[in-house]
């Protein structure tokens, strides 16, 4: 098969960094360098160039899709002769642990809320929908946090279903990385946002990923646009270990941290533990449950060293 034929048979349009950056068109930069610094994760160098060349074109594309969706809703209301309920546009962001999903989500939230329409953008992570530690311990699943079995999928599906049904307000549980658990009675109220960004490991999964739990609808059924943040496996491992070491010098030093006992470890021992955690838990979850969902995404962003995106694939 020729290169031309292979490009024609893929469901994705492919853009290198320069090609994608050109699609920004004339969209203005609405974030200052100080604001960008606040949005980046502990393990990332998020530059103003990265926002301009990768995230501004993406926010422009999403604004087109969202506007089109609103026009479609208006057509339906005109046909029915009703003033319809406010239905949020849902964007999901999936990918491995340590790939930078949270930073992508925060940057998109900031950019989309600054478009002239001043849309209200909520950000929810699916970590809150993990079963509490007490339940995971009872079921012997503490070493499988993030695997399909560790989530309260019924509650997560009900959350997105209620939003898509026009509910006035819904609640989402909140996860604390400090205590490594869902916060008891710490639910967040979500009141009819224009856009919901849902970030998590499992947001592209479907019935094929839950043979043990045969329910009929999934988060992906309610998502309007899905993003998969991708990177080579060796970089993911490097970023995971590096993040662990930074936490060891920062968050883990808090006496209330679930991982406080790691704070005093010598660096070589900490690297060994981080590597073990990566291979035994996070790499397994990536290979078995996360990576197989990549080709379901509307858009795939592939990162290289320094967390810089160098390839974007957009579903035709």
From Swiss-Prot:
The keyword ATP-binding applies. GO terms for cellular component: cytoplasm. Its EC number is 2.7.1.33. It comes from Erwinia tasmaniensis (strain DSM 17950 / CFBP 7177 / CIP 109463 / NCPPB 4357 / Et1/99). Pfam families: PRK. Its main location: cytoplasm. Belongs to the prokaryotic pantothenate kinase family. HAMAP family: Pantothen_kinase_1. ATP binds at residues 95-102. It is found in: Cytoplasm. GO terms for biological process: coenzyme A biosynthetic process. Keywords: ATP-binding, Coenzyme A biosynthesis, Cytoplasm, Kinase, Nucleotide-binding, Transferase. The gene is coaA. The lineage of its organism: Bacteria, Pseudomonadati, Pseudomonadota, Gammaproteobacteria, Enterobacterales. The keyword Transferase applies. InterPro entries: P-loop_NTPase (IPR027417), PanK (IPR004566), PRK/URK (IPR006083). Pathway: Cofactor biosynthesis; coenzyme A biosynthesis; CoA from (R)-pantothenate: step 1/5. Gene3D superfamilies: P-loop containing nucleotide triphosphate hydrolases. This is Pantothenate kinase.
């Amino acid at each position: 098969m020729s290169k031309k034929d292979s490009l024609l048979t893929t469901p994705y349009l492919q853009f290198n960094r320069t090609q994608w950056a050109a699609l920004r068109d004339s969209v203005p930069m609405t974030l200052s360098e100080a604001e960008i610094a606040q949005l980046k994760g502990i393990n990332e160098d998020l530059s103003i160039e990265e926002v301009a060349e990768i995230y501004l074109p993406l926010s422009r594309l999403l604004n087109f899709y969202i506007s089109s969706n609103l026009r479609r809703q208006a057509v339906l209301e005109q046909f029915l002769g009703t003033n319809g309920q406010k239905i949020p546009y849902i964007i999901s962001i999936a990918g491995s642990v340590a790939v930078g999903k949270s930073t992508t989500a925060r940057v998109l939230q900031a950019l989309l809320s600054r478009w002239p329409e001043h849309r209200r953008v909520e950000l929810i992570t699916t970590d809150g929908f993990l079963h509490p530690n007490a339940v995971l311990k009872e079921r012997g699943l503490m070493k499988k946090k993030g695997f399909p079995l560790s989530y309260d999928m019924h509650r997560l599906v009900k959350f997105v279903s209620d939003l898509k049904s026009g509910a006035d307000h819904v609640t989402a549980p909140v996860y604390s990385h400090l205590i490594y658990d869902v916060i008891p009675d710490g639910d967040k109220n979500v009141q009819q946002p224009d856009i919901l960004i849902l970030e998590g490991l499992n947001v592209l999964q479907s019935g094929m990923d839950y043979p043990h739990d045969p329910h009929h609808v999934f988060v992906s059924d309610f998502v309007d646009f899905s993003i998969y943040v991708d990177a080579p496996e060796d970089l993911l491992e490097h970023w995971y270990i590096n993040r662990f070491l930074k936490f060891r010098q920062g968050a883990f030093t808090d006496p209330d941290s679930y991982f406080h006992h790691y704070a005093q470890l010598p660096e070589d021992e900490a690297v060994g533990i981080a590597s073990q955690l990566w291979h035994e838990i996070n790499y397994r979850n990536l290979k078995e449950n996360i990576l197989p969902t990549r080709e379901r995404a509307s858009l795939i962003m592939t990162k290289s060293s320094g967390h810089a995106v160098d390839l974007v694939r957009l579903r035709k």
